Amino acid sequence: MNYMQIIIFLTYILLSSSFVVLSKKVCKKYTQKYLTNKFVPVLEEKTLIVQHNNKKFNKIQHNIFAQIGSNPKFVNNEDYHWFDGDGMIHGIYFNNSKIIYQNKWIQTKRLQLEEKWKRKLYLYFGELKGINGLMQIMKYSLMELFGFIPPYGKGTANTALLYWNKRLFALHEGDMPYELNIDEYFNITTKQRLHYPSLYS
């Protein structure tokens, strides 16, 4: 990307941001219910270990209970919708002496890029409303055009988990699956985004 493209992009961001601020003064204020009460995002990745001597857990030792859901890392408070959050896996591992809990963000291409810029970059479902929605679409289209956002890897991997052929995947309808790895110490990591040369999502 050359300097002229960067100048054009930054100028557009400045002008569109000013317009959006003005337009929000006369537009409807949208709900924030998906960021409150039981929907409050988890802000940190944690590992918690609880020792136990309960023999009831022997029946399920070396098993894992896991779920995945929407948990935004960078969020627009006003326009956020729970479809938009980054995928986060919550897992509990059992053995005969301890229970281990761990939560991890799925390291999607989308999240990695936003972590690099330390801000929200992608277009959110909840933003597609009114004048502000049109401006966000225009801004997002220019970011794609100038190469700030790649044409692939836009999914959040926040919809479901699939265990298939001894492999664990995080799924999202709008993107390829992300393969996860759980090692012998119950450390959850994102292994890779599946890629097939003749298949696009």
Region annotations inferred by a language model:
Residues 19-201:
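Beta-propeller domains
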Residues 4-16:
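Cleavable N-terminal signal peptides of Sec/SRP-targeted secreted and luminal proteins
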